[in-house]
């Protein structure tokens, strides 16, 4: 084998080893994003909910800052219950549809049904809750105690 081929092979192997240490992204995040867009009829981009208040986004602590943030806390709690059932909510894929009346779930397994219900409830809650720009990207160390 040529030395250049060995270097390429070595580089591929090293990159694969490094990639195996990277945690996977939540698989149902895209589905949740579409449920949100369906529920709010596209009135606000889904990423606006990724860093809102004390609970929308990664983690969560303290008292929710408003109704929308309470939706995220309820969603977090729902995922916690799903985990107690032995489900992996961030990795669970499910079937859903966006109909004229909004999104709805159409899934087969208990975990799929439960996780889809969590996401559906949150998406509908987001759609009916006011969005306060002042609660986007807040200093959680000060406001979420």
Curated annotation (Swiss-Prot):
GO terms for biological process: arachidonate secretion; lipid catabolic process; phospholipid metabolic process. Keywords: Calcium, Disulfide bond, Hydrolase, Lipid degradation, Lipid metabolism, Metal-binding, Secreted, Signal. Its main location: secreted. Residues 1-21 form the signal peptide. Its cofactor is Ca(2+). It catalyses: a 1,2-diacyl-sn-glycero-3-phosphocholine + H2O = a 1-acyl-sn-glycero-3-phosphocholine + a fatty acid + H(+). The keyword Transcription does not apply. It is found in: Secreted. Gene3D superfamilies: Phospholipase A2 domain (1.20.90.10). The keyword Calcium applies. Expressed by the venom gland. Ca(2+) binds at residues 55, 57, 59, 76. SMART domains: PA2c. One of its GO terms (cellular component) is extracellular region. Disulfide bonds join 38-98, 54-144, 56-72, 71-125, 78-118, 87-111, 105-116. The active site is at residues 75, 119. Binds 1 Ca(2+) ion. PLA2 catalyzes the calcium-dependent hydrolysis of the 2-acyl groups in 3-sn-phosphoglycerides. Belongs to the phospholipase A2 family. Group I subfamily. D49 sub-subfamily. This is Basic phospholipase A2 GL1-1. It comes from Laticauda semifasciata.
